[in-house]
Amino acid sequence: MNHPSATLLQRAQWLGYLGLVPFITGMALMILLDDTRLVAQAIHNYAAVILTFVGAIHWGRALNNGDTTLMSFSVLPSLIAWCSLFLEPQKGIPLTAIAFVMLLFLDRNLYLEMAWFKQLRTRLSILVCTLLSVSWLYI
């Protein structure tokens, strides 16, 4: 799938950017509200869910390629996300942001043949980390 159909590419982009809506909404609420505890927790929870989702991409690829090493690695993001939920958002949000960056570096090396995917993942990861960072500033 080095050259996806235009429909697949558009759908991946549309759904990827749609996944940013909770981060954008959460960040806006963090800026606007005086009491941000509930919003910070919601952002943290959503970041953990999305981190798990991004890790699951590797699970799918491992199943497709029969790569047991990649399959074993694919559960690490969900474990990091789960562990982060035991922390307060002021510590858990940065942990998930760091995990997103680490996962991005891995993806950029694993998906060399899929330039479109690398580009989309890079853009989405930068936006997610930026939105998480700005939200964190308002905790």
What are these regions (language model features)?
Residues 28-32, 61-62, 79-88, 110, ...:
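Hydrophobic alpha-helical transmembrane segments
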Residues 39-43, 69, 116-123:
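Non-cytosolic membrane-interface motifs at loop->transmembrane helix junctions
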Residues 35-49, 87-101:
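Structural signature of hydrophobic alpha-helical transmembrane segments
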Residues 2-5, 54-64, 103-116:
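C-terminal ends of transmembrane helices
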Residues 86-96, 104-119:
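Membrane-helix boundary connector in multi-pass membrane proteins
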Residues 68-83, 93-105:
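Mid-membrane cores of alpha-helical transmembrane segments in multi-pass membrane proteins
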Residues 21-26, 72-83, 121-137:
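Small-residue-rich segments of transmembrane alpha-helices in multi-pass membrane proteins
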Residues 4-18:
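N-terminal membrane topogenic signal
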